[in-house]
Amino acid sequence: MSILKKPDLNDPELRAKLAKGMGHNYYGEPAWPNDLLYIFPVVILGSIACCGGLAVLDPALIGEPADPFSTPLEILPEWYFFPVFQILRVIPNKLLGVVLMAAVPAGLIAVPFIENVNKFQNPFRRPVASAVFLFGTFVAIWLGIGATFPIDKSLTLGLF
């Protein structure tokens, strides 16, 4: 059964509304004023209230104060830079590491041209794009986890 109720076009009341121009050439409620004036402010204020409530009820600790005279053993970047950091750390030639990082967006740009004969949107019917996505996700996660290990165990994650 469908979630959406299809309109009964034989209903004289609906036909009269559509003849007057209500519906804006589509079925359903207009965005103004129903959504934009009433629902959006409720959602925005609710989101602000949830964030404010969480900030008051469970404040995040700032952590221990920074000590400029003691440097940690290994300085790690933010978590979203872990794969890039791992590439630069493992590849001995830094120019090659930068070229590899530039190859990632170049490869992503090339995917539609490689698979230009396939017009499907379903990922199961687009094997090249799906394979590139799965391989890239696996490599990014592997490199990201490896960045947290010492350099001698970073590529194997200590498994081998």
Curated annotation (Swiss-Prot):
Chief location bin: plastid
Listed GO biological process terms: photosynthetic electron transport chain
GO molecular function: electron transporter, transferring electrons within cytochrome b6/f complex of photosystem II activity; electron transporter, transferring electrons within the cyclic electron transport pathway of photosynthesis activity; oxidoreductase activity
Tree of life domain: Eukaryota
Cellular component per GO, a single term: cyanelle thylakoid membrane
Localization (cell): Plastid, Cyanelle thylakoid membrane
Record's bilayer topology term: Multi-pass membrane protein
UniProt cross-references to InterPro entries, sorted A to Z: Cyt_b/b6_C (IPR005798), Cyt_b/b6_C_sf (IPR036150), Cyt_b6/f_cplx_suIV (IPR005870), Cytochrome_b_C_euk/bac (IPR048260)
Parts of the chain that traverse the membrane: 36-56, 95-115, 131-151
Pfam families registered for this protein in UniProt: Cytochrom_B_C
UniProt keyword annotations, A-Z: Cyanelle, Electron transport, Membrane, Photosynthesis, Plastid, Thylakoid, Transmembrane, Transmembrane helix, Transport
Record HAMAP family: Cytb6_f_subIV
Record's function text: Component of the cytochrome b6-f complex, which mediates electron transfer between photosystem II (PSII) and photosystem I (PSI), cyclic electron flow around PSI, and state transitions.
Family to which the UniProt record says this protein belongs: Belongs to the cytochrome b family. PetD subfamily.
Subunit structure comment from the entry: The 4 large subunits of the cytochrome b6-f complex are cytochrome b6, subunit IV (17 kDa polypeptide, petD), cytochrome f and the Rieske protein, while the 4 small subunits are petG, petL, petM and petN. The complex functions as a dimer.
Protein name per the record: Cytochrome b6-f complex subunit 4
Organism in which the protein naturally occurs: Cyanophora paradoxa
Gene: petD
